[in-house]
Amino acid sequence: MAENLKGCSVCCKSSWNQLQDLCRLAKLSCPALGISKRNLYDFEVEYLCDYKKIREQEYYLVKWRGYPDSESTWEPRQNLKCVRILKQFHKDLERELLRRHHRSKTPRHLDPSLANYLVQKAKQRRALRRWEQELNAKRSHLGRITVENEVDLDGPPRAFVYINEYRVGEGITLNQVAVGCECQDCLWAPTGGCCPGASLHKFAYNDQGQVRLRAGLPIYECNSRCRCGYDCPNRVVQKGIRYDLCIFRTDDGRGWGVRTLEKIRKNSFVMEYVGEIITSEEAERRGQIYDRQGATYLFDLDYVEDVYTVDAAYYGNISHFVNHSCDPNLQVYNVFIDNLDERLPRIAFFATRTIRAGEELTFDYNMQVDPVDMESTRMDSNFGLAGLPGSPKKRVRIECKCGTESCRKYLF
């Protein structure tokens, strides 16, 4: 039995910091965790709980890492070397003073409710940092994820699991493609039209990896059976998110949102919408539950027929947090790579315009597609234009809060 377990590993339920705390509490050294006899009794500031000023001397109530709250002590400013923690403490203090009293001058003693708020804020920051670390440990894409909440005390969402690709539900099979292209150069010298041509469609990208098809047209990328390599210009969506993105708390009642930390060029791929693939019947059952929550995470895959739905409520990637806008900067495309079943496309977001660093990413939950000239879409004359993937399931009338000039007032 032991031999069968060699080389196996499991995820630890405790974070690195939590394990270090346990070692110090138990007075155990652990070289793997960086806890030795030399630093076992070192005191490290976990966060600051309170503040007071006596005869021009500043004091802080310090919560020490690895020690209970009852062991917190008042320390003079000169004893503390934690510049980052001190700076964040005063930033949070000033912001809350402005919110409560419309002034930012620090009092000599803090009101108990204000001190309690600062403790809760410090604990929230730790929880969000742990969540950020978990997200980055699970992501398989190049782009990093940061998390930010400067609005309220909400922490990480409960029961949400970050995934990088579809989670296939019971009774659903994703059939792998059997053949691939034989191209020497898929963009400039495609053999038989490459993978798009094999499906009687046109090549989707230019030499910069930007989509050049009209919205509503499918994208066929090269697959795992193709002769071309990783650098093939027809492999874009499958390479995953390449931009650094931030999950942030909105200040206008829209919950969490996503902003880009980098400039994104027009028509560039941004992210996929992933979640659980479930049948439409199961989606109807879950939808009745989500209705009471005002949820909009059910996304119909109705490229050719409404058979399957993507549910990103509990399993999803960063697209789970992207908000609606009636004037969005992201457009949805159906993408086919290793599975060519037209009932099960992958859902990809592309930029509709140049998006500045720091700008929020949005898509239209009730998207529509303009009519497209049939001859410009597919290579044969029997093509009937299939539409965009379905919007998140439209069940209840939800008020829109996007605030754009073209706002329709309701999501659905």
From Swiss-Prot:
Zn(2+) 1 binds at C181, C183, C186, C194, C195. The modification Phosphoserine is found at S391. Changing C326A: Abolishes methylation of histone H3. Residues 255-377 are annotated as: Mediates interaction with MECOM. Its main location: nucleus. GO terms for biological process: blastocyst hatching; cell differentiation; cellular response to glucose starvation; cellular response to hypoxia; chromatin organization; circadian rhythm; determination of adult lifespan; DNA damage response. It comes from the Eukaryota. Although the SET domain contains the active site of enzymatic activity, both pre-SET and post-SET domains are required for methyltransferase activity. The SET domain also participates in stable binding to heterochromatin. This is Histone-lysine N-methyltransferase SUV39H1. It comes from Homo sapiens.
